[in-house]
Amino acid sequence: MAGQSEDPSLERHFKGHRDTVTAVDFNANTKQLASGSMDSCLMVWNMKTQMRAYRFVGHKDAILSVDFSPSGHLIASASRDKTVRLWVPSVKGESTAFKAHTGTVRSVSFSGDGQSLVTASDDKTIKVWTVHRQKFLFSLNQHINWVRCAKFSPDGRLIVSASDDKTIKLWDKTSRECIQSFCEHGGFVNFVDFHPSGTCIAAAATDNTVKVWDIRMNKLIQHYQVHSGVVNSLSFHPSGNYLITASNDSTLKVLDLLEGRLLYTLHGHQGPVTCVKFSREGDFFASGGSDEQVMVWKTNFDAGSYPDLLKYRQNDTFPSGGDYTSIVQPADVHQPARNAHVTQAADLEPHITEMSVKDRSSPLSYTSRSVDQHHPQAEDGNLQTVASTLEHIVGQLDILTRTVGILEQRLSLTEDKLKECIEQQQATVPPSHSGTKKSSF
């Protein structure tokens, strides 16, 4: 039986969204967590306790996808308002938006090198963009229904997409051709992603299943029927040995891909779980749901064998559970009681600073102070509020100074023109005579 110390546990419980949480993602150093919601807001949560959260306001409709850039300097968000926004997660709240599609944008994702974006939309297309200046590169157009999700492969050579046409398509980025279609799902495919090795893909579907394909052999190698509701999202552990899934049945499931079995069922959300994501190192994962909550869990279960998992990654192999692996709840694995870990978690409602959007026509600067880079003496909420207010005042004073300078220049020009007019007038008027000529008789 697994020891208690190896069970995943709920570490944080963030409250602040006003509607269903639709997407979550950690930055590279796991110091921040971004979440998007049907409330149209992007939240950035600081993992360090007692630090404020930030609400970024700019989208005009629901946010359906968020993704941190590999460097952590940018966050991309996709919205029902048909736009994609790039945010600098700083106290300035800078953002740039571009109209990406003619329909709802369901998905946005950075490439591994952080230079490209891929978006998926209800307009049935997938589009690829440069991050710098958001230049459109090309579109992929073979789906015949809404495209729910699109992701780059780890090496950036391939793109995988999932659609309501019940297909998953694999695309070659260079040739821009569809090189494989998988049509084995009984329902719509909500989410798809690459295994960290790039050799497999996993998909979550409305028929309550999770399927894993080997894209080298174009073969279904694992088939999980462990949820009793629609599967909304999934995430691979960076080791490649575990897969976590989120479902409308209110649970998260941890799957052991090496052994082809269900490892844990996690309860915590009060309603459908809509999104889940491992941190870059795999030591945490976050989930969001229709209960408007963001939960951060400590992984724990990979601690004892992590070196072996990394070795597995290096060998670039992937476990096959046969043609189909039917999964049942194992009797020898500790199953935490419903909400057992929730009471142990920090139930946080941090002070939230709302950042109204400041759209930029020029490229975003990455040098702004990040929202997690506070000095110790500024971590107190009141001091941060004062600092933010002072920064705003300084900005306004700078604007006033520039305005006064412009007015002084205009006044000086006016004075010069007036002086010139007076001089010209004096030069054209003949001198007048003061005396009058007397007539003689």
UniProtKB/Swiss-Prot annotation:
Single GO cellular component term: cytoplasm
Location of the region described as Disordered in the Swiss-Prot/TrEMBL record: 347-376
Basic and acidic residues composition-biased segments: 348-361
Coiled coil region boundaries: 400-427
Places the protein is found: Cytoplasm, Cytoskeleton
Domain of life according to the entry: Eukaryota
UniProt keyword annotations, A-Z: Coiled coil, Cytoplasm, Cytoskeleton, Repeat, WD repeat
Entries under InterPro entries matching the protein: G-protein_beta_WD-40_rep, WD40/YVTN_repeat-like_dom_sf, WD40_repeat_CS, WD40_repeat_dom_sf, WD40_rpt, WDR55_POC1
PROSITE patterns: WD_REPEATS_1, WD_REPEATS_2, WD_REPEATS_REGION
Secretion signal span: none
Biological process annotations from GO: cilium assembly
WD repeat ranges per the UniProt record: 16-55, 58-97, 100-139, 142-181, 184-223, 226-265, 268-307
Chief localization: cytoplasm
The protein's assembly and partners: Interacts with pat.
Summary of the function given for this chain in its UniProt record: May play an important role in centriole assembly and/or stability and ciliogenesis.
Family: Belongs to the WD repeat POC1 family.
Stated name of the protein: POC1 centriolar protein homolog A
Source organism per UniProt: Xenopus laevis
Species lineage: Eukaryota, Metazoa, Chordata, Craniata, Vertebrata
Gene field: poc1a
